[in-house]
Amino acid sequence: MTSKRQYPIDQSNQLSQGQNPSPQQPLQQYPQQPYQPNPTYGNDTTQQWNQTPQQQQQPQQQNISPPQSQNQNGVQNTIHTGGSKRVYPVDPQNETLLSSNFSNMNLSSQQQQPLPQPTHIPVPGPNTTTYNPYIQQPQQQPQQQPQQQPQQPQQPQQQPQQQTQQPQTWNTSPPQTQQQPIQTFTPHISPPQTQQQQPQQTTPFQPMQPTQPSYSQPQQTQPLPLPPMQPSYNQQPYTQQPYTQQPYTQQPGQQSQYQQPQQQTPQQQAAVEQPVPTLENLCPKPFMRLSMNAIPNHPSILNKVHIPLGLNIHPLAHDPQGPVPVVYSSIIRCRRCRTYINPFVTWLNGGGRWRCNMCENINDTPQDYFSPIDFTTGKRSDILNRPELQKGCVEFLASSDYLVRPPQPPTYFFIVDVCYESIVSGMLNTAINAIKTTLGDLIEKSNGRARFGIMTFDDSLHFYNLKSNPSNRPQMFVVTDMDQVYVPPFEDFLVNLKDGLEVVENTLNIIQSMPRTQQKVESCLGSALKAAFSICERVGGKLIVLQSYIPRGPLGKLSIRDYQPLLGTKKESTLLQPSNDGEFYKELALSCTSQQLSVDLFLFSNDYTDTASLGTLCQITGGSMYYYPSFVASRDGQVFAANLIHSLTRDTAWEAVMRVRTSRGLTINSYHGNYFLKTSDLLGLPTIDSDKTITLQMGISDSIGQKYASLQSALLYTHSCGERRVRVFTISIPVVSNYQDLFRYADISVVTSLISKMAIDKALSSSLNDARDAIANKCVEILQAFKAASTSNPQANPAVTLSQNAPKLLLPETLKHLPLYVVSMVKSIIFSSRTTHPDLRAFHMQRMKTLDLNSCLNFFYPYFYSLLAPPNYQPPTTPNTPFVPHSFKLSSDELQRNGLFAIVNGYTLYLFIGEQLPQPVFTDIFGVPDVSQLDINTFQDLPILDNDHSRYARKVIELVRNSYPEYLKMFVVKSTDRQRRPEFQSLLIEDRTPEGCSYYEFIIQLQSRITQN
């Protein structure tokens, strides 16, 4: 029997300088218990999503029940919102800048780098007002700070040998600097200006008042000049403070210039002691974003504002500024909490010691890391050579202390269904062609280290020996006993892809051309997964499963649930949870996680597949699930091939674990994403790719006495090139004592994403109807809190109204589109009351758990474009000329009978053909003379034709598809199409639909609820 190895876990709380790692945490067993939305499999429970920790239960409010339309005769039979057009309210850049084109939802101290992403900017946004929490405001009467109770220091995990000194009180205001404009749309976060030092007094936080329109250039603080690097700083003992005295020097022929030693002034101490968040040292927003870019200093303030506090982490996001800098020097960490060195630590004793910004423990600086501090700048002399002290996003090259075994090469093992349905639908042929296309990229990305293996199955298992032989043809083994699967040694079925490329290509050709006369419909997926696990358990990697039937073998057999009577009832949520038969896949997923194996599922079926049960494999192992119902290669082959290629070639972290650390007072309540919770704060991620995010739901457990709060995430992983690295993100944000200020710093992108993930948990634990009510109630609670804040201090909380035709509903500037997203969310396929196949709804629920912010917002509020060029359109003169088509509001008011429109939600692209579209225009775009000759069942993309209409339509489609990681499936919707037209109409969420009221009616109900309360 093969012995199981213990695989690398995060050593972040176990390794200290000069010490060996502690023994590995034993594998957490999966207990028998009711389903929980997050795969914690322990005693951790998810709190009620619409309540924060230590929050008193609010009286149940009257739920918003959107009136159902009684008679729908088409798109035109709707209640409209007026003739005004709404600019498309989505943050297209996956980033909320201070001068946002969408809304002021990004008043953050954690700002990102200034370069925008052109492929994600399809629409400019409305004017907004910008605020900056780090710029000192006009003189106002400071608010009385409540007396804070002294906090007990956190108990260290390892007792230091010497007693640490107590932190001192410092003035936190840096020197006043000049502000100059910059020529970018990304703001700079300016530090507060220096104020007169007063003993035992600090300046309270002053919220900023709007001073300029949104399209004015943001101001940037001029950086102070840095001194030249000291050539001999490594020779000075770190216990000395050479900058506190001026040594005696006398030039020949001159009089003595000796001066008395000078003590550090309070201003010098402040410059050294208080690091200030700036644009350069904060983690860029594509990697890490908070729902509120300011932290309340007490739990009661968070409870009063009702905005959920959460953190969105995108570990492998694309950064327009370039790759993340890699640090090859030794890793410096806090002795107590194991925080990594970052730009927000405080340097003491001239650089000889440093205070942790998380736990405030004072640590000694290693001699090989010491550098003196220049008190004129408050920075180390070697700051330019230390990326970890300049940027909030760096990677450390991990030492041998972070290794339990040598880094394993990337391993790809394919499990392909070759049943009758896979052959006749064209899935097998499409998959083999796509795999052939990726072989060269897999070799290049792994520096020739990638391993490859493949097996096929129907009612038996087929293994292929890929070892090199004189004929370069594989040897095939067939196993028919599905109860006790015998697997030969794994070395025969996993080969180095570069060395065995010819054998691999021949194997794929043989599988593709193998004659299959019997129509086998049995699928032994469970046995195939067991065999693949036995082959790959020693090396880890990724299992890619292509499945056409619901599993019917002796292992992992899933029964077809009778779902029709449950649709539309409270018990519908049971169809979205794993069945009792799915326990096999949960246990298998836990075994895969312990051996660093992830599972990617590609599901093709004409009937019920039970994606809720099979999706557990992806959810626990950090994999992905793709769902193609009623797959036909002539219609869906292009989408499937593109997504398979993307899933294999995207950036991937292997053998990963992640931990998030917070400063005192902040707590992490739950996680959302595909992961396995090894301990209370350690996430196991066999793989995590560039498309996935992890969302944290947070709370405040105690008063926060510091001026800034810090958060740091650390991802320990194996790079595809073979290096073991630690990717560290760090942010520091201001702490406020007035809940009215929090509305200024809300980020609607993170707030919307967090509400949707919490609502999914609510739907799984209760019902879809309760989830819809909870979404609407959360919106009411936030707007009620804002109304109370505006009533008490109107000047500090500027409000906006939607339009002149809409009801006078006051909304915070940063959350002015929250009601629109709430309506979109309730009408989406995830929460809609419309009859929906449970496989499709469960698939989208799991997909939403890992979506990035841009894809999440656009899924709820899609893009709406016209594919006909406007009259004043001028073609771009150069290929690099920006192209931004106009997006309409999602209402039937924008539809025209002689038009051609596209609606895209990041997953599907709908083309709506008006019934009076001119015949010459139709021919120029589709290449056929009449709409009746267009086969919508096999249509995949627009043909490439040499005319202006075709070029413009294809340019819009290309722009939209490049904005998403997945390839979009395209559907053609004719005006007479009874199947696709209801799907298209359901995306016009601002109109009244069978799923609920119009946006205008929802605003009226919101105003009524807020006024009554």
UniProtKB/Swiss-Prot annotation:
Q: Which GO terms describe its molecular function?
A: SNARE binding; zinc ion binding
Cite the InterPro entries for this sequence.
ADF-H/Gelsolin-like_dom_sf, Gelsolin-like_dom_sf, Sec23/24_helical_dom, Sec23/24_helical_dom_sf, Sec23/24_trunk_dom, Sec23_24_beta_S, SEC23_SEC24_subfamily, vWFA_dom_sf
A GO biological process held by the record: COPII-coated vesicle cargo loading
Biased region (Low complexity) positions are 11-39, 47-73, 97-114, 136-223, 231-269
Locate the region Zinc finger-like: 334-359
Compositional bias segments (type: Polar residues): 126-135
GO CC terms: COPII vesicle coat; endoplasmic reticulum exit site; endoplasmic reticulum membrane; Golgi membrane
Biased-composition ranges for Pro residues? 115-125
Q: How does it sit in the membrane?
A: Peripheral membrane protein
Query: Which keywords appear in this protein's UniProt record, sorted alphabetically?
Result: Cytoplasmic vesicle, Endoplasmic reticulum, ER-Golgi transport, Golgi apparatus, Membrane, Metal-binding, Protein transport, Transport, Zinc
What Gene3D superfamilies would the database entry show?
beta-sandwich domain of Sec23/24 (2.60.40.1670), Sec23/Sec24 helical domain (1.20.120.730), Severin (3.40.20.10), von Willebrand factor, type A domain (3.40.50.410), Zn-finger domain of Sec23/24 (2.30.30.380)
Amino-acid positions noted as binding Zn(2+) in the UniProt annotation, renumbered to this chain: C334, C337, C356, C359
Segments for region (Disordered): 1-273
Tell me where in or outside the cell this protein is found.
Cytoplasmic vesicle, COPII-coated vesicle membrane; Endoplasmic reticulum membrane; Golgi apparatus membrane
- Cited function: Component of the coat protein complex II (COPII) which promotes the formation of transport vesicles from the endoplasmic reticulum (ER). The coat has two main functions, the physical deformation of the endoplasmic reticulum membrane into vesicles and the selection of cargo molecules.
In which family does this protein belong, per the annotation? Belongs to the SEC23/SEC24 family. SEC24 subfamily.
Q: How does it assemble?
A: The COPII coat is composed of at least 5 proteins: the sec23/24 complex, the sec13/31 complex, and the protein sar1A or sar1B.
Identification of the protein by name: Protein transport protein SEC24
* UniProt source species: Dictyostelium discoideum
Task: Tell me the classification of the organism that encodes this protein.
Answer: Eukaryota, Amoebozoa, Evosea, Eumycetozoa, Dictyostelia
